[in-house]
């Protein structure tokens, strides 16, 4: 069992993402003291069952930062931004800093959500923060279930210390609400891979054209 904290600006799709996993949605518990919903998400691996207790902020990040109680004992994290809203990516370093102040040296995945939406404001090649901080990055679409399992698989491998760990069955997910243009998305991911071989920009503020 691992405590997974999910952070990012309001409206980036954190709750939608967590709620895709149906058993977690069915068994969630509300913790009024810190205003969070805790969803137990189960994944079945070749090494047995892994349960992530996903802490979802219940929207209180809209009132400024989150209390330390939200982060304490966090063993892994997902930082989410919305590829259709530039500001949510610009705020990623702040979320990362707040997280690392309380949780040192935990595995973190950066997720760019809503890649099913046509008009991206944050291009794949502009996403460089994960390279500076040595985080894993995935492009996801919560509403279409695209890449849903990837962040969990990465974190499970890190936490288990086993790069060969794999899921032996898919979790029960809510049916997709939207379809994703896979050809266009593969193009974005190719750009991402290409950008990964380029030197990082010098400035801290990620360049937007």
Swiss-Prot record:
Small GTPase Ran-type domain: residues covered: 1-162
Iron found in the keyword field: no
Keyword flag Protein transport: yes
Signal peptide location: none
Annotated stretches, region: Switch-II: 59-75
Pfam families membership: Ras
Renumbered residue ranges of the record's region Switch-I: 28-36
Alphabetically ordered keywords of this record: GTP-binding, Nucleotide-binding, Nucleus, Protein transport, Transport
GO MF entry, a single one: GTPase activity
Biased composition (Low complexity): 187-196
Any one Gene Ontology cellular component term annotated for this protein: cytoplasm
InterPro entries on file: P-loop_NTPase, Ran_GTPase, Small_GTP-bd, Small_GTPase
GO process terms (BP): protein import into nucleus; ribosomal subunit export from nucleus
List of residues binding GTP: 9-16, 59, 113-116, 141-143
Region (Disordered): 187-209
UniProt-listed SMART domains: RAB, RAN, RAS, RHO
SUPFAM superfamilies the UniProt entry points to: P-loop containing nucleoside triphosphate hydrolases
Localization terms from the record: Nucleus
PROSITE patterns according to UniProt: RAN
Role noted for this protein: GTP-binding protein involved in nucleocytoplasmic transport. Required for the import of protein into the nucleus and also for RNA export. Involved in chromatin condensation and control of cell cycle.
Name under which the protein is recorded: GTP-binding nuclear protein Ran1A
The organism of origin for this protein: Lotus japonicus (Lotus corniculatus var. japonicus)
Encoding gene per record: RAN1A
């Amino acid at each position: 069992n691992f405590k997974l904290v999910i952070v990012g600006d309001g409206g980036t799709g954190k709750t939608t993402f967590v709620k895709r996993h149906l058993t977690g949605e069915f068994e969630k518990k509300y913790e009024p003291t810190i205003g969070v919903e805790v969803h137990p998400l189960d994944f079945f691996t070749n090494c047995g069952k892994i349960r992530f207790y996903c802490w979802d902020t219940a929207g209180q990040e809209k009132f400024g930062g989150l209390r330390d109680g939200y982060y304490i004992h966090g063993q892994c994290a997902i930082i989410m931004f919305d590829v259709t809203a530039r500001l949510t990516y610009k705020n990623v370093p702040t979320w990362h800093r707040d997280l690392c102040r309380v949780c040192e040296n935990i595995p973190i995945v950066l997720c760019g959500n809503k890649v099913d939406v046509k008009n991206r404001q944050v291009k794949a090649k502009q996403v460089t923060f994960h390279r500076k901080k040595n985080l894993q990055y995935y492009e996801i679409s919560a509403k279409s279930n695209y890449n849903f399992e990837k962040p969990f698989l990465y974190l499970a491998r890190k936490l288990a210390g086993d790069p060969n760990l794999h899921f032996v069955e898919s979790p029960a997910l809510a049916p997709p609400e939207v379809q994703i243009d896979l050809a266009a998305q593969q193009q974005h991911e190719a750009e991402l891979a290409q950008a990964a071989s380029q030197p990082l920009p010098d400035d801290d503020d990620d360049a937007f054209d």
